[in-house]
Amino acid sequence: MSRLTPVLFGAQLLIMGANAMAAQVSAYDENALRVESRQGNLQILRGIEGTVVARAGIFHPPRLANLVIQSDSAVAEAKIFERNYEPGQWIAALGIATLGAAIGASRIPDVNPVIQVSLYATSFGALGYGGNRLHSAYGALSKAIWWYNRDLKR
């Protein structure tokens, strides 16, 4: 009987260690974030099940910093995202509207060409600047989620 005790004790340790490892993996699997885009809306999902924890629609950014509060690096990137996302959308929308006005003005006879050129220049400038802000925002979103997932307990 005394020889069997260490074997049983070792087997129990192996089984308990495997259960602890499975619990850690499932904790990561349940809390990791990912991003999906559905019908023009950005969604931030948590875990394998894909629970939606934040949405970003047109002119409506998600509050990402609240989701990634556990990681300081993720919060810093989330603030960059929040600072650039909404202004980028508004400025790009202004550029699209100005482009429409420029095209409309070009169809009207006897319009001063300076007006047309000004509208086109303004629209391209706004589209470029807004697109750059959105590009920075999406890069920061990617980094924030990466930092958050990296710092999760495994």
Regions found by a protein language model. Name each.
Residues 34-69, 79-137:
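Hydrophobic alpha-helical membrane-anchor/signal-helix detector
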